[in-house]
A protein has these predicted regions:
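Short, basic/glycine-rich phosphate-binding loops at helix/coil junctions
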Residues: 5-6, 63-70, 117-126, 201
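Beta-strand elements within well-structured catalytic alpha/beta cores of enzymes
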Residues: 3-7, 36-41, 128, 148-161
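Secondary-structure boundary elements
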Residues: 29-34, 91-97, 133-137, 147-156, ...
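Surface-exposed, charge/polar-rich loops and edge strands
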Residues: 124, 133, 140, 144-154, ...
Length: 217
């Protein structure tokens, strides 16, 4: 079974970070090559669950503002994983409708890390939305998608462990992370290692650093 990955993507300039690039490049070299990739990005919240375009001719979604032009000139024309999209729809229960958006392709939470891991854009990719922020519901969604991994489909969750942008006193590169961020990160890593699903689902009440770590949830 191919692993599921959780990647931090940050803003588009993260592709200029040598450490981040080296880590993702190493992962791509060490892991089995996927038959296809299914991405869930924190940048696309849409209910009901929505499946993005499977056509490589659909432009990327440049969902960021105020950056130099060359970040908007990036292309990533990976094949669309139409068969994976069909399996996602088939895996959903009858009382949870699925929508298709033929005009939305990959956003920067999806294509930025993929340009590093699979720069030749030769692995089929499809993106789906986050249909809810409810952890229990998302856990059930993950359980429905899990069988895709048996067929070599890599599931990627893309986002940050914390996202307390309003509370960052110093957002510059190399700044010392705030305590609420480091404490939340350490707690999450510990709970994942212990497979403590109950605690992770109830992170709003149990995790240190809340609500600063995730003020929008």
């Amino acid at each position: 079974m191919i692993p599921a990955l959780y990647l931090s993507h940050g803003a588009p300039p993260l592709v200029d970070d040598d450490l981040w690039v080296s880590q993702l490049t190493a992962w791509a070299g060490e892991l089995p090559r996927p038959t296809a990739i299914l991405v869930v990005s924190a940048h696309w919240e849409s209910a009901p669950l929505t499946i993005g375009s499977t056509s490589p001719r659909t432009p990327l979604t440049y969902d960021f503002w105020g950056f130099p032009q060359h970040y908007y000139d990036v292309t990533y024309d990976a094949p669309g994983a139409a068969d994976v999209a069909a399996r996602v729809e088939a895996a959903m229960p009858a009382d949870e409708p699925v929508r298709h958006d033929p005009h939305r392709r990959l956003d920067h939470g999806a294509y930025v890390p993929l340009t590093v891991m699979y720069p030749d854009a030769d692995v089929p990719v499809v993106q789906i939305s986050m249909p809810t922020l409810d952890p229990q519901h998302l856990l059930r969604l993950g359980e429905r998608l899990r069988p895709l991994r048996d067929d070599g489909v890599m599931l990627i969750g893309s986002g940050f462990t914390t996202h307390g942008l309003p509370f960052l006193d110093d957002p510059s590169p190399g700044a010392v992370p705030p305590t609420w961020s480091t404490e939340f990160d350490a707690w999450a890593a510990e709970r994942f290692a212990a497979a403590d699903v109950d605690a992770l689902i109830d992170f709003r009440h149990r995790a240190p650093g809340m609500p600063y770590a995730h003020p929008t949830i």
